[in-house]
């Protein structure tokens, strides 16, 4: 049996980041960012989803980001790719329902920025960290994948769970007030001390 036909769980976790204003980045850099963060997921899903549909069983888990719930200065294209991941996941979930293949499940995971590694140095101010604290380790994300997505079947768990407040704020606040709140908790300045990729790749 081909591995494409026998896979039960696919976790799409490829990701990279370029920071800075969008117009300051090269076309090549932005294309690479889009390919790694989004387009690659389309190809892996197309490779393994047919086998899951055939047996009407399987779970595809796509790693998105907290930036899929709100924009972020100096992360415009990164955030856009993560919004795309969330939209792809939601749309495919509906597609398999229409196909009568509800045994194939889809989840998107939305972790806030990791304090170490790719987003080291990224931080909000004190108020912002209360509302949207950073993720301490990859293990915290892994536990959410296993416990909330795989075991409980959550469609789009946030990491940490308090990040659901961001979704609530977006739904309740008018745009003009949401901009002020974003400034108040330090969203505009969160990339000022970024150290994750100091070479600017």
List where the protein language model places each region.
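Short, small-residue-biased leader/transition segments that mark boundaries at the very start
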Residues: 1-3
């Amino acid at each position: 049996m081909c591995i494409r036909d026998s896979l039960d769980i696919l976790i799409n976790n490829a990701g990279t980041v370029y920071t800075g204003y969008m117009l300051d980045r090269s076309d090549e850099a932005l294309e690479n960012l889009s390919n790694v963060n989004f387009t690659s997921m389309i190809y892996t899903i197309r490779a393994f989803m047919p086998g899951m549909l055939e047996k009407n069983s399987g779970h595809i888990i796509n790693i998105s980001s907290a930036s899929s719930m709100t924009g972020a200065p100096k992360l415009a294209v990164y955030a856009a790719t993560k919004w795309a991941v969330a939209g792809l996941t939601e749309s495919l979930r509906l597609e398999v329902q229409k196909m009568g293949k509800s045994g194939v499940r889809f989840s998107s995971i939305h972790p806030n920025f990791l304090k170490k590694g790719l987003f080291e140095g990224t931080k909000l101010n004190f108020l912002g960290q209360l509302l949207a604290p950073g993720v301490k380790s990859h293990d915290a994300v892994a536990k959410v994948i296993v416990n909330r997505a795989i075991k409980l079947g959550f469609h789009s768990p946030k990491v940490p769970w308090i990040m659901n407040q961001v979704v609530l704020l977006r739904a309740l606040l008018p745009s003009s007030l949401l901009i002020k709140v974003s400034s108040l908790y330090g969203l505009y300045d969160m990339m000022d001390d970024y150290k994750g990729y100091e070479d600017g790749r």
